[in-house]
């Protein structure tokens, strides 16, 4: 079945993800809103681009690692085996690749593609991250989700994918995301460090 969440306005990428997660978490055995200790109808949650930049066939590979190989979070990685991106201009490739490198350097999460939006989660991972709360609402949201899963000692794994850019429409990503990534990630990391002292 396909369920479509209608939102009143565009409130940011992170807000859209959070609304989707909250909807899935609300589908527990009692169907009575978000109750973090209930049994959920959905075992896993997957996020992906709806323009087929992410190949739906790769969902099956993700599922194997979540259900059979003991992983808690599986990332469709553009950079695990090099740079596997089709139809991106070089400046977009560089922004994404070095953005992931910077995020990895700051967070120390051993993942090559921390900015990937093609991710499979066990639902308890989403539950525990949502309990802690999410700070970012832009593209850094993706990094924060993986960082917090890592901090919570969940098992993260990357599978290589080929990302093919859309043939119609335009990406909303631009250089305005850089300040959030540069300064926001530093703040997030420092906050985590001092919370453990």
PLM region descriptions:
Residues 52, 61, 143-144:
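An aromatic- and histidine-rich active-site surface loop
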Residues 2-3, 7-26, 40-42, 56-139, ...:
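Acceptor/aglycone-binding surface of glycosyltransferases and processive sugar-polymer synthases
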């Amino acid at each position: 079945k396909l369920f479509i969440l209608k939102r009143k306005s565009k409130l940011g990428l992170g807000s859209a993800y959070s609304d989707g997660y909250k909807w899935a978490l609300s589908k527990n055995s009692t169907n009575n809103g978000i109750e973090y200790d209930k049994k959920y109808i959905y075992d896993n949650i997957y996020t992906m681009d709806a323009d087929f930049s992410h190949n739906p066939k790769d969902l099956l590979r993700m599922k194997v690692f979540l259900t059979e190989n003991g992983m808690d979070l599986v990332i469709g990685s553009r950079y695990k085996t090099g740079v596997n991106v089709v139809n991106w201009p070089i400046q977009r490739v560089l922004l994404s690749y070095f953005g992931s490198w910077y995020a990895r350097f700051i967070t120390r999460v051993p993942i090559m593609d921390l900015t990937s939006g093609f991710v499979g989660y066990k639902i308890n991972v989403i539950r525990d991250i949502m309990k802690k709360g999410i700070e970012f609402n832009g593209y850094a949201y993706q990094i924060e989700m993986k960082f917090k899963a890592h901090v919570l000692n969940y098992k993260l794994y990357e599978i290589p994918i080929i990302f093919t850019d859309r043939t119609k429409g335009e990406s909303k990503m631009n250089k305005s995301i850089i300040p959030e990534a540069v300064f926001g990630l530093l703040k997030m990391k420092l906050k985590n460090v001092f919370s453990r002292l």
